[in-house]
From Swiss-Prot:
Protein name (record): Sister chromatid cohesion protein SCC4
Gene coding for it: SCC4
Main subcellular location: nucleus
GO cellular component: cytoplasm; nucleus
Subcellular localization(s) per the UniProt record: Nucleus; Cytoplasm
């Protein structure tokens, strides 16, 4: 009796301190039970250790301490025949600890035991819900280790458990997760398409009131549809989902702001009502207002948000209020795909990816700034400041750091591509140097970014007229990825740079690169690579004077660029080549029309090199037609644009970063010392390579959603075949 009274008293005191936000004192009350000389019942100690571990995971970085409490609690529970919910909670929390510590084999073994227990108890709703929880976590461990078949099997088991209890939100959670795995492994188009159709079918069965309880499920489903469309380079159909995401994110943000204002007012009212000397009439009015505010908060809030779940945040242990979360599913999963801030940034990124090829540079620049600011704020919360390197990271922060660092690289990649498109080479330099510096500080976490950095160095080098260096960096990029599609793109870009040099040796190298690519377009995962290969091959055929075949190839590439990709810059470049071809075939009427369209697009994009390219062909056209007045007017405009380009190039070449970016050398990395912390970092980060929840289709290791690498400029396809324009 004495022990029970002491425990009740300490639990009550812990409740009091927790309501006041005094987490340290709350933990001390619970630790007093665990360390007391008084003999408590096993259940008392178990409940105390469970609650203590949950607090440590949520409010501190002491994962090992939490793990010790949970392991002790699990031992105590073995002597208790029932108490299944406590056992399930213990298994789930301990699994989270192993996940945060990157102890994946122990986590997998623990989850298998938890599933065995869940299948052996009476099969009520609680047992099925916990089966969903454990299958979800088990699938995640398999994904981290790139065991996609086992992950799909675990997710299918979770789906069946959700189906047994007719829980459509959970069914959708597992269906979307299976689509996610299919997108990551992408064995064939048919399997992924079937997974997409299954998601659409399940989504139709969920009523709107249920989706409101799990707002993250909508974002997860829509984002996966965007990834799927981008992977197919189906940018036009991806746009519909991007628009839905953007509208939903704005609506959700406004809703959360309203709720936060209500909560702030409610907190102020509660403080006023706590005064003992408050007049009764005023107290009555404040109480009525309090009731109104609480009803409004309840109406706006997801039903699961008001429940204090024992589960910690699914990713990491950063304490965040429920208004900052986008829950994927109901309790006891309550998981997030990514934190709300990461989803916010990702939506901005999708808007950039869909808008940049269309030349919507003002909106894209604004979104890039917003996304980078969100990421910078989160990196600071994770302790990543200017001097921090990956070896300095807390182990529990590695996963979440990688999410935001990878997102940051995606934004910087798009900034480089955007600035190169509109001929702002100094801005492109700065963004590319930022990418390089982040990579040298976090080489293991950002290992997948090295290929794209080399590719962008090649694009920058080509843009400023360093064609040999451009080819070098594109060839180096092929060595840094196992993606056949990415390798094909890099080789195509290198071939264009070689063709721009124009001498016999370089043309031979271009032929060696393009020849093997020509026969493999059907084996590539997207039309983006095919468009790049067709451009390079068409250019080669033009240099070989096989004009009719060149026209056929370029016409096919133009159709892809226009119908599937919607990339105005690539369309302008294709049109320029086709206009020049028409001129070479003495079809001056068609040449004039094609070149006018190309020049219009190049002007819209502020793409000065392409404008100059078109203007030089116009000069040849007017000379052929004997239109002296048009020729002089055209030359005057061309000279103006030439001077503008030379000014920009001089500024870029005069930058302190120019030499290091074009130099024929890979990025030098600092050496990792052989200490346990850094070895652990390498092991855990390598286990996650390629498995960030942003699939390849966004642009790191696989088909980039918008061809930042279509910077195919500096080519003179007029009379002086193969000569440099600069």
């Amino acid at each position: 009796m004495e022990g029970a009274a002491v425990a009740e008293g300490l639990w009550g005191l812990a409740d009091h301190h927790q309501k006041l936000g005094e987490i340290g004192k709350t933990i001390k009350c619970l630790e007093a039970i665990c360390q007391s000389q008084i003999s408590f019942l096993p259940l008392v100690e178990v409940k105390s250790r469970l609650r203590l571990a949950a607090l440590l995971l949520r409010y501190s970085h002491n994962v090992n301490h939490a793990k010790s409490h949970l392991e002790r609690s699990l031992l105590l529970l073995k002597s208790i025949p029932s108490s299944y919910d406590l056992k399930f909670q213990n298994y789930s929390l301990l699994s989270h600890c192993y996940h945060l510590l990157a102890s994946f084999p122990p986590q997998r073994n623990l989850l298998v035991k938890a599933l065995e227990l869940a299948s052996s108890v009476p099969q009520d709703i609680s047992a099925y819900l916990w089966s969903c929880n454990f299958n979800s976590q088990l699938a995640n461990t398999f994904i981290i280790q790139a065991d996609f078949p086992s992950s799909l099997s675990a997710l299918e088991s979770g789906f069946l458990s959700a189906s047994h209890i007719c829980f459509p939100e959970l069914q959708m959670f597992f269906t979307a997760s299976m689509l996610h795995v299919h997108i990551m492994q992408w064995t064939d188009d048919y399997s992924v398409e079937k997974a997409v159709q299954r998601c659409d079918e399940i989504w139709q069965t969920i009523s709107s009131d249920k989706t409101d309880r799990c707002p993250g499920l909508f974002f997860y489903n829509e984002m996966l549809h965007v990834f799927y469309r981008l992977r197919l380079c189906d940018y036009k159909n991806a746009q519909h989902h991007v628009d839905r995401l953007d509208q939903a994110m704005n609506a959700h943000s406004h809703k959360m702001q309203e709720i936060q204002q209500l909560l702030d007012e409610l907190s102020s009212l509660n403080l006023s009502l706590s005064r003992y000397d408050l007049p009764s009439r005023e107290r009555s009015a404040l109480s009525a207002r309090q009731s109104q505010l609480q009803d409004r908060v309840n109406a706006l809030s997801p039903s699961s948000s008001t429940v204090n779940s024992l589960e910690p945040a699914y990713f990491g242990n950063i304490d965040r209020g429920w208004t900052e979360k986008l829950l994927l599913s109901p309790s006891p999963i309550d998981g997030e795909w990514l934190p709300k801030s990461a989803i916010d940034a990702l939506v901005h990124l999708m808007v950039v990816i869909s808008g940049r090829p269309k030349g919507l540079f003002k909106e894209c620049s604004k979104r890039i700034e917003s996304g980078l600011q969100i990421i910078q704020d989160e990196l600071i919360k994770l302790g990543i400041t200017d001097e921090v390197r990956e070896a300095d990271l807390r182990h529990t922060a590695i996963w979440m750091s990688r999410v935001f660092l990878m997102l940051q690289m995606q934004f910087l990649e798009n900034r480089v591509a955007l600035e190169l498109t509109r001929s702002d080479y100094v801005e492109a330099e700065e963004a590319l140097v930022d990418m390089k510096n982040w990579f040298t500080r976090f080489p293991t976490i950002l290992q997948a970014s090295e290929c794209m950095i080399e590719m962008l160095r090649g694009q920058y080098s080509h843009s400023v007229g360093c064609y040999s260096e451009a080819a070098f960096h594109c060839i180096e990029a092929t060595k840094l990825t196992e993606s056949i599609s990415m390798q094909a793109s890099c080789q195509a870009f290198a071939a264009v740079s070689y063709l721009t040099i124009g001498d016999a040796e370089s043309s031979s190298k271009a032929l060696d690169l393009i020849g093997p690519l020509n026969g493999m377009t059907n084996s590539l995962s997207g039309v983006r690579e095919e468009a790049s290969i067709l451009f390079a091959y068409g250019l080669l055929l033009m240099k070989q004077r096989d004009l009719q075949e060149a026209r056929n190839r370029l016409a096919k590439g133009l159709q892809i660029a226009h119908n599937h990709m919607g990339n105005l810059q690539l369309v302008a470049q294709y049109l320029t080549l086709l206009g020049n071809l028409a001129l070479s075939l003495h079809d001056t009427v068609q040449a004039r029309e094609i070149l006018r369209s190309s020049l219009t697009l190049a002007k819209k994009l502020y793409d000065i090199p392409t404008q100059l390219w078109v203007l030089s062909i116009f000069t040849a056209l007017y000379q052929q037609l004997g239109e002296k007045g048009n020729e002089m007017e055209n030359e005057e405009f061309r000279k103006k644009k030439w001077d503008e380009l030379q000014s920009r190039l001089a500024e870029a070449r005069g930058s302190i970063h120019h030499i290091e970016l074009v130099a024929k050398a890979r990025i030098e990395l600092y050496q990792i010392d052989n200490n346990p912390q850094e070895q652990s970092l390498v092991a855990s980060a390598q286990s996650m390579q390629g498995n960030l929840d942003i699939p390849e289709s966004v642009g790191i290791e696989g088909p980039s959603p918008a061809p930042s690498s279509s910077r195919l400029v500096g080519l003179d396809t007029g009379k002086r075949w193969g000569k440099r324009r600069m």
